[in-house]
């Protein structure tokens, strides 16, 4: 039978636990928390953080003292600060349950005003980071009066929140300052009324607040902040009008004029990188970013990171033609999570993240894999991975091959220090070369293999140092003066060093230091920034390849060092004796009597969310989600309230996330219905209160990796149902109650890669088994197996094919029935109108972009996308005492199978994914509908 199925069945819907998709957040480490109280903070730490506790407390109190004076405001309660030893451990925090990418340096949340951060940074940067996050705590108290509900519902622009934090923390370095300098002189400064997001929001907002203080003083800046609080929705335009009596257009004009004045001197004296030599390009018309150049010994190829495929790859560029030659990491992989590429996948540090082997056959790069990082040796001839080495330290990056190719030097963090390590490629063993409190990074070998040059920072700035490999304690300082010096490399004859420095006007340029005469020459004078110079021999002589920031992105350029300008001499190398440390304004002594173990785990409101979904037959699905957590997010109580067309459902769960094995307990009360038809009259009826299930379960899941996890549950359900029977040609419902113990086990995998609009590549699947026992009759009440598999095949950057196969089968004394239809399961059919204990449906879609942004005076629509789809499904009822005859196809036509085809559109509207579908049912030969069945629904697609 086609369309509605015969309503002769028994319904049991076993509650499934943990069958949601998504990659895993793996808790690799165990954290035994302690607390240290200071006048304004409660600092949470564990054993690996304790050696740095005094430093953290001093930086935090110094930041509080400065901000309280500037803002003339006091935080009423001690501020929780949760410190992690490294970024790898910080990524395991459960304060935010979602995955945390390495590009996120730290965060603050309005729920209990918590600051969460890693401490594996140079002291000066750590102090700025703490102050940045502390500004957010002041914002939560000033703007939201410490109320979580207001924080979640007030829509203050990202540029305001992050720009204020950046400005009051004064955390901009020379790389960051290059962004607004480049945007201003390129006439790309947006309006404060625009929705500025991403990294640019930090830089743009920083300069807005700098402008406000420059024009109206600190009092004017405070007025701006408090007027923003006084607007009901956080509308910045109203705050600007109230604080400065300016409309947005006037404010924008004055702001842009002020910016141009700030950069007048730079614009007059500096230029585009092309003025110093030609650029490298992937191909004509392709906009991409490139960074971290490394030159092959032959001089014919340059390895670099590139984003031309909307991913971060390692590619080779031809030096003579300055064009893309080969992609070494083409395609998608699960052998690693991502390549370690500063400014692309991780935050900025020092130096380059690629290295060529002396024989030119191998390119070294670090990648994230599991808890830490691995060193990948890429095949420069054919692409792909030749070999990989696990790295025992955290945050490994910036590889450099020794001249004999037997070892690789790199920067890493361990024991509270950032040092240079040496990896033996034959044994896989590594040893610490620098082992000092300074922040050491960006190593490079001298051509004779006797020395190592690296960048080291103990106070405000990083300088170049040299150590003797035969005696690593024998070190000398090579560069001096203002600014940071980094990213060194040797000239081909070994007589000079090329490096990047921001010693002039705070702008990074490329310099050449003659190691014999100590004469210094500047090779570039760019508006943005120039980094990571490497020497290459061409037919025209020695050239220097480097990366430069211009027109909003990083690109590779080549310049002639002979055209450089002499800018003086460096002092003679000096032996390293004493290094000046970074000193905070306030020093806090760690007193053991103020340290206490964390014993209680009280819960508090952490998050609230609401969602709605609507289908074409008028069915309204609404949900409210409430989450309560302890201080560290490791113990949570989640409550889900749901309404399906007037039927209310409830589920509450306690979840323990403190270790890798995650477990929980849940209780629930669930009611639902489906659409059926009387087999004799054909009259459609909507069955009210078809079933109700009340019960509880214990569940657990164990992540085997980022991509795969095992799950299981056992529990008990009390069921109250209306059981359908046929008597005398009429359909009757008999009340039936059951007590059902059950077991469940499954596997879930997810390797999906996402674009901003949704999944783009990879696959996700779940396979699980449920066994429900018959407490009354004995044996098995229902035994079922489920498979939900989805595959995404990229066709281009924003085109993909999407496939889904769902299948479920059940048997037993009273097998479970499964229902689907409508939304994006089987379009052209009513919601939940297809039912059976043996079901399957298949969806195929081609998804493509239509309009990226549609800006109207009253509305901004984004990601307007289209699709063409085909749905095929089947459902059969095969119960004890009744078996529905079923034949999927007959003579090339669908008989009991179901199918539809059509097209649809999706758009993000007011932050919600909204969908329109136009479907026609067909039997593989003939269309069964005259016109399209139109559906409108809100929710997330597969």
Question: Residue locations for each model-derived region?
Answer:
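Beta/coil-rich, acidic/histidine-enriched accessory regions frequently appended to metallopeptidases
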Residues: 22-37, 196, 228-355, 368
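Outer-membrane beta-barrel initiation region
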Residues: 554-555, 560-664, 737-759, 838, ...
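Blade-terminus and WD-like Trp-Asp/Gly-His loop motifs, strongest in beta-propeller folds
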Residues: 293-301, 353-362, 399-407, 443-451, ...
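C-terminal outer-membrane beta-barrel translocator/porin domains of Gram-negative envelope proteins
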Residues: 590-593, 665-672, 678-689, 696-699, ...
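A flexible loop/linker signature enriched in serine peptidases of the S9 family
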Residues: 286-288, 305-315, 332-339, 344-349, ...
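Amphipathic alpha-helical substructures
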Residues: 73-75, 149, 156, 176-266
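Transmembrane beta-strand segments that form the barrel wall of outer-membrane beta-barrel proteins
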Residues: 221, 600-616, 622-645, 650-652, ...
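Juxtacatalytic substrate-recognition/specificity segment
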Residues: 19-157, 174-176, 193-194, 235-239
């Amino acid at each position: 039978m086609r369309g509605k199925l015969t309503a002769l069945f028994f319904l049991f819907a076993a509650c499934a636990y943990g069958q949601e998709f998504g990659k895993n957040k793996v808790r690799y480490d165990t954290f035994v928390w302690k607390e240290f109280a200071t006048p304004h903070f409660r600092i949470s730490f564990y054993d690996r953080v304790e050696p740095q506790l005094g430093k953290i407390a001093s930086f935090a109190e110094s930041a509080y003292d400065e901000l309280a004076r500037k803002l003339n405001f006091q935080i009423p309660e001690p501020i929780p600060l949760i410190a992690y030893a490294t970024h790898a451990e910080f990524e395991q925090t459960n304060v935010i349950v979602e995955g945390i990418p390495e590009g996120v340096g730290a965060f603050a949340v309005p729920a209990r005003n918590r600051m969460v951060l890693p401490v594996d940074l140079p002291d000066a940067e750590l102090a700025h980071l703490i102050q940045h996050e502390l500004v957010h705590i002041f914002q939560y108290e000033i703007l939201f009066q410490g109320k979580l509900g207001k924080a979640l519902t007030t829509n203050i622009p990202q540029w305001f929140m992050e720009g204020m934090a950046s400005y009051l923390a004064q955390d901009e370095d020379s790389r960051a300052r290059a962004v607004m300098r480049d945007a201003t002189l390129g006439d790309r400064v947006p309006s404060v009324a625009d929705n500025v997001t991403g990294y640019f929001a930090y830089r743009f907002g920083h300069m807005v607040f700098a402008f406000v203080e420059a024009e109206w003083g600190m009092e004017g800046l405070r007025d701006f902040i408090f007027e923003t609080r006084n607007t009901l929705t956080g509308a910045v335009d109203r705050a600007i009008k109230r604080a400065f009596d300016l409309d947005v257009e006037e404010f924008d004009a004055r702001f842009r004029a002020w910016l141009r004045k700030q950069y007048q001197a730079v614009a007059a004296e500096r230029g585009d990188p092309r003025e110093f030599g030609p650029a490298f390009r992937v191909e004509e018309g392709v906009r991409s970013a490139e960074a971290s150049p490394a030159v092959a010994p032959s001089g014919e190829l340059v390895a670099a990171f590139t984003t031309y495929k909307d991913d971060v790859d390692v590619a080779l560029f031809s030096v003579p033609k300055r064009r893309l030659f080969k992609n070494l990491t083409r395609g998608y992989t699960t052998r690693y999570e991502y390549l370690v590429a500063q400014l692309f996948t991780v935050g900025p540090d020092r130096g380059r993240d690629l290295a060529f082997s002396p024989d030119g056959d191998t390119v070294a790069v670090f990648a994230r894999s599991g808890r830490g990082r691995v060193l990948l040796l890429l095949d420069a001839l054919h692409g792909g991975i030749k070999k990989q080495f696990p790295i025992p330290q955290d945050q490994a990056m910036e590889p450099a091959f020794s001249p004999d190719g037997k070892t690789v030097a790199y920067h890493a963090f361990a024991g509270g220090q950032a040092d240079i390590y040496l990896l033996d490629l034959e044994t896989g063993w590594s040893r610490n070369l620098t082992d000092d409190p300074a922040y050491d990074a960006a190593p490079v070998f001298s051509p004779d293999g006797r020395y190592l040059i690296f960048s080291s920072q103990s106070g405000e700035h990083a300088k170049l140092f040299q150590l003797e490999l035969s005696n690593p304690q024998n070190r000398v300082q090579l560069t001096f003066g203002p600014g940071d010096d980094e990213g060194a490399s040797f000239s081909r004859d070994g007589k000079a060093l090329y490096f990047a420095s921001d010693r002039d006007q705070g702008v990074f340029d490329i310099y050449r230091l003659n190691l014999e005469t100590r004469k210094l020459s500047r090779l570039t004078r760019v508006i943005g920034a120039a980094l990571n110079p490497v020497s290459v021999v061409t037919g025209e002589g020695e050239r220097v390849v480097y990366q430069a920031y211009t027109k909003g992105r990083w690109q590779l350029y080549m310049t002639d060092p002979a055209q450089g300008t002499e800018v003086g001499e460096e002092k003679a190398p000096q032996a390293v004796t004493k290094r000046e440390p970074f000193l905070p304004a306030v020093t806090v002594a760690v007193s053991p009597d103020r340290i206490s173990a964390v014993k209680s785990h009280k819960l508090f409101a952490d998050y609230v969310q609401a969602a709605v979904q609507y289908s074409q037959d008028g069915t309204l699905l609404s949900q409210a989600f409430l989450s309560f957590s302890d201080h560290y997010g490791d113990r949570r109580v989640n409550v889900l309230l749901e309404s399906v067309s007037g039927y209310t459902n409830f589920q509450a769960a306690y979840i323990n996330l403190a270790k890798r094995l995650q477990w929980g307990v849940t209780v629930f009360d669930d009611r639902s219905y489906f659409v059926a038809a009387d087999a004799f009259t054909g009259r459609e009826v909507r069955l009210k209160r078809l079933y109700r299930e009340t019960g509880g379960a214990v569940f657990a899941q164990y992540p085997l990796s980022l991509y795969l996890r095992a799950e299981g549950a056992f529990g008990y359900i009390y069921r109250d149902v209306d059981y359908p029977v046929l008597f005398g040609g009429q359909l009757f419902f008999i009340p039936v109650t059951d007590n059902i113990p059950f077991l469940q086990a499954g596997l879930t995998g997810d390797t999906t890669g996402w674009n901003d609009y949704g999944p783009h590549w990879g696959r996700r699947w779940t396979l699980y088994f449920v066994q429900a026992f018959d407490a009354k009759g004995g044996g098995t009440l229902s035994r079922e197996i489920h498979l939900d598999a989805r595959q995404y095949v990229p066709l281009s950057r924003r085109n993909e094919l999407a496939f889904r196969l769902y299948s479920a089968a059940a048997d037993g004394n009273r097998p479970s029935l499964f229902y689907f239809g409508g939304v994006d399961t089987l379009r052209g059919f009513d919601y939940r109108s297809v039912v059976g204990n043996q079901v399957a449906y298949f969806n195929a879609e081609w998804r493509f972009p239509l309009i990226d942004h549609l800006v109207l005076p009253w509305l901004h629509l984004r990601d307007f996308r289209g699709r063409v789809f085909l749905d095929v499904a089947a459902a059969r009822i095969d119960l004890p005492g009744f078996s529905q005859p079923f034949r999927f196809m007959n003579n090339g036509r669908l008989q009991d199978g179901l199918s539809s085809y059509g097209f649809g559109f999706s758009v993000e509207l007011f932050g919600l994914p909204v969908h329109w579908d136009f479907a026609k049912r067909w039997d593989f030969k003939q269309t069964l509908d005259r016109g399209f069945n139109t559906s409108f629904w809100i929710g997330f697609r597969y």
